[in-house]
């Protein structure tokens, strides 16, 4: 039985909310939602070790506004019903629960009074007079405040607790955040009646990373989180760093095996790591897809690379496709920026990458030298500084964009917009303060230090948050601010129009803007109001340059606030939305939406974009994903809603297919346990839809221009496959299936090859990917670039679509050379066919070594020609003279053998 409470209590700019409590009774195979969704942020759970249906939940509650859905909640029937057993007020929630499993009736809990403001990254009001420690002696039914002497005076912030074992629940540690950016660790030996400060290191108590975990066996050992992972073996008096790195890793959680304290799991910003020796050595967090990404960009190379900055793990440039079967560490490199960076490659030269990092820093990374230059408009960092005290103020994310239109100007912004036409060597300020700040305000006064919402804008807390240059017109730029304002310039900043939608309220963050690739007057904005305690989806579109806006978020689920909306560059009515609850698609310009989750994890999507027919998304803590080839979605967007309900089988027009080899590996493949990303298919992606109630055989045929069938695939049989000796674990073998023939949408990939040539003995390729493909060689010659026909036969209907095969742009071979290669491969196949036929007509010695030396046999000829055929399949180049000589020699041997 596993219980989960959702929603972070770590107080940070992008704190993630949850939707209550879940429980599994089958070790995580299935889950049941048990309510408390309005609590939003759950800090801890206690499950009675004597009865798995009894639990207590510590709910911090909504962090951006008052709510009664906070405090301690208890259930005695497995979550069917909940009773709030401790509540102080609508701004004070519960942060932690601690107990000794040997004394399950005695529980300790901490309450935390706090509230976040949308205009602040740091300096949030995280202290309150109602924060404190509470104790229950009846399994959480009733609670009393612990007011023992020695505790610090209020106001207090986040309090984290740990109960030592074998002390009758009397020894308790508390890390307590106090005023003046202070904090310390306290300990009681009498269940809370008396406390003493045992460690004055304020970094042990914080609103973001402060936590304590007691060793389940040793009563003197306690662990603490923070930038490093720390351990005390003297009751908290001193702590030593067990694990960390320069820059800090931010450790947030620790589980210790109660039966073997040497075995632990610790969770950090990057992921989770495991130790079996008490922290002497650890596993890697690079074996799990836990990257937390903010902004996306791609380059114009092939294969294109994806760029982003992740939380506490730096920047990423990673190939969207690998030449070696799967995307691995070989396909990744950093690009010199900061954590939570927005990284944008120069559209003219992908070796130059610009990064927008902490506190307004803009960097320029050169792949040729690996050097990073600070090219900020004002190279004085404002990181972690009060925004009303600095020259230029930035939000958590510094916006950065490069125009796709020559001369490819680069834009960034604080409260004003900057433009550079020379790669950041110089900048021009091209806007006034767009945040709405009142220049007459004295920002040093206390009314701005603790400004309420109605004065925050005037005080100068606002900043530009998103920039979108038009991909159609130089100088046409849209910007949005974190306090709910939208502006547009059509002349490079000489004049700005305030085009804010009338219904957009103050401090509604304009998270991302998408300037249309189809129309200069069209733009989409994603509006995030969850920092105003409004979790409803908000997004808008204008088709008249901001004169009017239409809200398009209504069809999205409640609670799925919108981070990004992008228009498909080929189908203007096709939209994609990234929300706090996943990805959605609209086929009618936002009038209606439906889920596009498919196999995605349920997590927030911070950014997405469409490139080369692929949909690329950046998630909040679950890596980068790609939906390869959105041709089916474009097809649906192009037809009327009534036409989407098909009555007969339908073949979707395929996108151009590139001649690619799925795996070029010639070395020992990476082992199955090596973490990798999935390579996109290599070949023609063929999508077809079968109507409801369909039954019957399905066939796909590939036809040449003369109508001859190149390849055929059906739902009843797999294509004949040569036999080869399996000398490795079956993990490496894929599981090919016949064409699907069930109702619904199906996808099949043709590898753009003719059928393999006949052989007497095939072999498995070393270019293998576990559980996906270990090809049997020879694999067949590639078809030439050009036009082909795909025919779908389903039931009594046949449908044909044209398929265009194009060349890998990296290949320099001419059409004449490719035709020469194919002709030679066909010659080799013809001689092989005659050799195999002859072998079937003769009695050849069972083992090659039984033949007399120097005597020609069909097998020896076939062996040489099979090796030649395999070599020819590996490259796009005309055959060499030695290869031609081998074919001639083996053909002569065959003639002599036939004559004999």
Give, region by region, the residue ranges found by the protein language model.
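Beta-propeller blade termini and top-face loops
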Residues: 1-674, 681-684, 718
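Surface-exposed coil/turn segments at beta-strand junctions on protein surfaces, enriched
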Residues: 154, 167, 518, 679, ...
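Beta-strand-rich binding/interaction modules
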Residues: 365, 686-687, 694-713, 787-791
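Low-complexity, Pro/Ser/Thr- and charge-rich linker/hinge segments at domain boundaries
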Residues: 633-663, 802-836
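Contiguous beta-strand segments within globular domains
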Residues: 664-699, 703-704, 743-749, 832
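Glycine-centered tight-turn motifs at strand-turn-strand junctions
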Residues: 709-781
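Short acidic/polar inter-strand loop motif in beta-rich domains
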Residues: 755-760, 793-801
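Mature extracytoplasmic or organellar-lumen-exposed domains after removal of signal/transit peptides
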Residues: 787, 794, 801-803, 836-900
């Amino acid at each position: 039985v596993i219980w989960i409470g959702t929603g972070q209590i770590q107080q940070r700019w992008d704190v993630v909310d949850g939707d209550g409590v879940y429980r599994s009774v089958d070790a995580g195979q299935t889950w049941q939602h048990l309510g408390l969704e309005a609590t939003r942020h759950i800090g801890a759970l206690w499950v009675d070790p004597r009865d798995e249906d009894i639990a207590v939940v510590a709910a911090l509650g909504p962090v951006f506004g008052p709510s009664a859905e906070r405090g301690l909640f208890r259930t005695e029937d497995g979550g069917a019903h909940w009773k709030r057993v401790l509540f102080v007020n609508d701004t004070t929630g519960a942060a932690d629960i601690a107990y000794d499993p040997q004394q399950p009736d005695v529980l300790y809990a901490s309450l935390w009074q706090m509230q976040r403001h949308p205009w602040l990254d740091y300096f949030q009001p995280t202290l309150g007079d109602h924060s404190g420690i509470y104790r229950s002696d009846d399994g959480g039914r009733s609670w009393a405040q612990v007011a023992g002497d020695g505790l610090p005076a209020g106001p207090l912030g986040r309090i984290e607790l740990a109960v030592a074992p074998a002390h009758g629940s009397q020894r308790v540690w508390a890390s307590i955040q106090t005023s003046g950016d202070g904090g310390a660790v306290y300990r009681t030996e009498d269940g809370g009646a008396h406390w003493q400060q045992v460690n004055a290191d304020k970094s042990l108590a914080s609103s973001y990373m402060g936590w304590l975990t007691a060793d389940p066996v040793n009563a003197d050992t306690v662990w603490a989180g923070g930038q490093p992972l720390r351990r005390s073996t003297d009751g908290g008096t001193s702590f030593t760093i067990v694990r960390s790195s320069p820059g800090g890793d931010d450790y947030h959680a620790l589980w210790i095996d109660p039966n073997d304290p040497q075995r632990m799991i610790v969770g950090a910003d990057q992921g989770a790591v495991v130790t079996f020796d008490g922290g002497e050595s650890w596993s890697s967090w690079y074996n799990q897809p836990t990257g937390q990404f903010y902004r996306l960009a791609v380059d114009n190379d092939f294969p294109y690379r994806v760029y982003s900055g992740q939380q506490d793990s730096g920047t990423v440039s990673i190939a969207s496709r690998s030449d070696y079967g799967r995307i691995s560490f070989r396909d990744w490199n950093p690009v010199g920026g900061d954590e939570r960076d927005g990284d944008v490659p120069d559209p003219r030269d992908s070796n130059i990458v610009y990064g927008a990092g902490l506190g307004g820093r803009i960097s320029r990374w050169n792949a040729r030298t690996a050097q990073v230059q600070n090219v900020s408009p004002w190279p004085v960092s404002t990181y972690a500084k009060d925004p009303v005290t600095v020259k230029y103020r930035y939000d958590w994310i510094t916006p950065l964009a490069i125009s796709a239109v020559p001369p490819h100007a680069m834009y960034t912004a604080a409260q004003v917009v900057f433009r550079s036409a020379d790669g950041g060597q110089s900048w021009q300020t091209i806007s006034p303060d767009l945040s709405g700040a009142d220049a007459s305000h004295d920002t040093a006064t206390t009314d701005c230090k603790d400004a309420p919402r109605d004065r925050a804008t005037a005080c100068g807390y606002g900043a530009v948050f998103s920039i979108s240059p038009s991909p159609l017109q130089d100088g046409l730029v849209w910007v949005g601010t974190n306090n709910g304002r939208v502006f547009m310039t059509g002349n490079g900043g000489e004049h700005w129009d305030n085009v804010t939608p009338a219904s957009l309220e103050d401090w509604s963050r304009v998270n991302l803007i998408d300037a249309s690739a189809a129309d200069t007057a069209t733009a989409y904005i994603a509006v995030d109001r969850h920092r105003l305690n409004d979790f409803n989806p908000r997004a808008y579109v204008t088709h008249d340059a901001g004169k009017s806006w239409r809200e398009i978020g209504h069809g999205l689920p409640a609670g799925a606030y919108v981070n990004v909306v992008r228009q498909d560059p080929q189908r203007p009515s096709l939209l994609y939305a990234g929300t706090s609850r996943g990805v959605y698609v609209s086929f009618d310009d936002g009038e209606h939406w439906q889920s596009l989750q498919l196999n995605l994890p349920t997590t927030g999507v911070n950014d997405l974009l469409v490139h080369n027919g692929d949909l690329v998304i950046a998630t909040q803590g679950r890596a980068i994903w790609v939906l390869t080839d959105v041709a089916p979605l474009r097809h649906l967007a192009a037809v009327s809603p009534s036409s989407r309900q098909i009555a007969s089988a339908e073949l979707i027009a395929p996108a151009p297919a590139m001649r690619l080899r799925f795996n070029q590996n010639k070395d020992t493949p990476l082992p199955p346990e090596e973490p990798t990303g999935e390579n996109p298919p290599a070949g023609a992606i063929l999508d077809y839809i079968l109507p409801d109630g369909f039954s019957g055989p399905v066939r796909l045929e590939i036809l040449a221009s003369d109508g001859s069938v190149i390849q055929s695939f059906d739902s009843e049989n797999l294509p004949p496959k040569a036999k080869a000796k399996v000398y490795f674990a079956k993990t490496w073998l894929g599981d090919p299936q016949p064409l699907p023939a069930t109702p619904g949408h199906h996808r099949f990939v043709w590898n753009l090859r003719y059928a393999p040539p006949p052989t007497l003995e095939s072999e498995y390729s070393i270019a293998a990917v576990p559980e996906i493909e270990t090809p049997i060689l020879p694999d067949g010659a590639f078809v030439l670039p050009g036009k082909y026909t795909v025919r779908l036969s389903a039931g009594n209907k046949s449908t044909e679509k044209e398929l265009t095969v194009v060349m890998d742009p990296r290949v320099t071979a001419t059409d004449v050379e490719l035709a020469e290669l194919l002709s030679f491969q066909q010659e080799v196949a013809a001689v092989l066919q005659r050799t195999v036929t002859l072998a079937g007509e003769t009695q050849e010695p069972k083992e090659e070594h039984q033949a007399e030396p120097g005597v020609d046999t069909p097998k020896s000829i076939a062996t040489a020609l099979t090796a030649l055929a395999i070599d020819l399949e590996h490259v796009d180049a005309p055959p060499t003279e030695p290869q031609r000589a081998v074919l001639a020699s083996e053909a002569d041997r065959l003639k002599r053998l036939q004559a004999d």
